[in-house]
Amino acid sequence: MPSPISPLGGWIARWRDRQTEFPHELAVCAIFKNEAPYLAEWLTFHEGIGVDHFYLYNDASEDNFSEVIAPWMARGMITLTDWPVHPQVAAYNDCIRRFRMQARWIAFLDLDEFLFSPTGQQVPDVLTRYRGVSALFVYWVLFGSGGNEVQPDAPVLEAYRRCLDLEGTRADAFDHGKSDDRSNYVTGWSRDGKSIVNPRLVRKQNVHKPKSVWAGPILDENRRPVRQRAVDSPVSYSILRINHYWSKSITELTAKVERGSIANRKRPKRSLERWLARERMLNGSVDETVIPIWRRIAAQADYDQARSK
């Protein structure tokens, strides 16, 4: 295979990208494990904002996820891959390798992340202004528990409305406990996000953004180079954003810490005390930007009726 800086590699990538029609305009790739309680909401929402296919990687789930995703499987909207051994990044790169000619754009998300445009536009319509980039980096908004010890009887998008606002994100100087084993993040963790990539131009994908590309820049929504987690990172999410329901309830956060990292199974178990300290950062402001968008989608999809079955 040509190297990432090879002119031939870039030429091949650009040649592939000359294709003008794709089976899917915007797909999402995600790896999951025992997420059955959340899958229907997540799938419903993303279908509603313009996602027309899902590449899902099942990490040895033991719950009833197959029943939950059955309606989307029946409509041909999900490509399901069993992925019980390899970690998250390997799944992402498998997706690029196998499906680069199937989707114009692929967004890499977790099941607690919800991509949308605050303008109310469909995301594929927004993406038309970013043709030529290898990846569009979308900053996230981090949501806390809102004081909920357990999950309320409501969709995630309705239940959690307290977050770290833009001013707090830009000023974040919380010491996330950098250590040699990388078991905790470093300062600037809130100034992060995920990427929507042109899979023909990306050579290798990491969790948050491409590790290497064949051609094309990696830019944010304002067409600026990405300064991920940097002190002077120009965080902006007025065009596209990701609501990251990082903790959900305190009970769910505790379980998340106990499960460990899906991205790196060799990473030592995280510190619950430090993660609870992080969570306390994320409840200072109320943000309901997504609520009207979600309610419109839920009504159109008859989500409440489907949820009660």
Which positions does each model-derived feature cover?
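Short beta-strand/loop segment that forms part of the nucleotide-sugar
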Residues: 52-60, 81-84
